[in-house]
Amino acid sequence: MTRNKVNRRDFIKLSAVGLAVAAGTRAISEARASEAVKGEHQWAMVIDQSKCTGCGYCTLACQAHNDINPDIEWNKVSNTGEVNGKMVYLARPCMQCEHAPCVEVCPVGASYYRDDGIVMMDYDKCIGCRYCEIACPYQARSFNWEAFDGANPAVPEWGTPEVERRPRGVPEKCAFCYQRIDRGLALGMKVGVDIEATPACCVACPTGARLFGDLNDPESNVSQLLRKHTSYRLRENLGASPRVYYLPVDEAVTEEG
């Protein structure tokens, strides 16, 4: 009897996972009507791979300002190979997709859109089902199996916490340092220009590889970069429309060193 019950429970869990994946795929392709009405600002990030050195400062600043467990990374940096003898790196925050499968599969509405395009998490509402984590095509979410009760090794060297720690048993993710954006706008600052109103990862980058701004503003730094340079987004064929753009490695730059 016990064995049959365990098998049935496992079957139900596996079925739920399958449904989450299927729903995520459907959400991307159909772009359903639950998307937020677009507001005055539409935030985006541009990452220049020609400038990224893989130093990891962005990850450390993110962990400090968002008070993240050192075993979890909201911003991941990986080595993707070489171009003309120069190492190429790929930095991956949450992509803040316009058609986010994580939002579509959440059964309790804990994942949701802000009108400025940021995909948010209501950690108090989250039930820890992990459907969003499974549905995300970018592996942007990390499930915290244990409560983070200790000291944060990234504090104070890389910044001080600006948000509360998440409860145990929820999938955590980057939210473009929304707290800095909101505070900056309230104080009349220019997001993406004024340091206090810009995501911590962008501020910490020593080479200026990460830029942030408003796609609705044609004069913003991101709008100008995207007009002047060739860019790409990860897995564009899925139709999720991520808000993180990459400037590919310029071979002329790598030849110059």
Task: Identify the role of each PLM range.
Residues 1-19:
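N-terminal secretory signal peptides and thylakoid transit peptides that target proteins
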Residues 5, 25-56, 233-240, 245-246, ...:
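C-terminal segment of N-terminal export signals and the immediately downstream linker at the start
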Residues 28-37, 64-92, 112-125, 139-170, ...:
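Non-heme iron-sulfur electron-transfer modules
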Residues 45-66, 86-110, 120-139, 164-204, ...:
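Cysteine-centered iron-sulfur cluster-binding motifs in ferredoxin-type domains/subunits
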Residues 15, 19-26, 66, 140, ...:
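A generic secondary-structure signal for well-formed alpha-helical elements
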Residues 179-257:
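Long, compositionally biased charged/polar accessory segments in the mid-to-C-terminal portions
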Residues 78, 175, 245-247:
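Residues in well-ordered beta-strands of folded domains
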